[in-house]
């Protein structure tokens, strides 16, 4: 679900306190959104609808300070409010994580070229929007979406950079399939979908017990 900036900041702090690298999925390939998340302390960004090398380079420009990118210098939490900018700048040159989200057939077709960029650390598939870009939203058995996902699977097999997949409806068989396909970066479920499906499952179980 969508969250505001203060909620994002709180989540970054909680995740960091558990010695895990916080990644923020921004709502758009927008320099202000990316900069705010990074200045708040995100270790990396997941950027939606990266369909081309040009889209990827736009995000890279927003993530990195010159000379790699054109990110403006802000003295926020990540830079220890100015006291730690020099240390942060050294860290940022090598440690920022950039994960493009591939959720359009154009992104699938350009995936090899996108992954060839040094600053790209991997990718994650957004299956629903990908199926929508093929005019078959949610039709997982349709030949066009099957072919597109097979093409991505081949890219995963031929690249050292990790491939990811968003499994929207948590399902053990789907999870096992994607892991077998070589995906190593899994977004498993969606908060509201997970709650709704779990409640439905439990209610069905309760109904069966009552019938006995």
Which ranges hold each PLM region?
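Expand to "…catalyze enediolate/carbanion chemistry for C-C bond making/breaking, isomerization
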Residues: 1-212
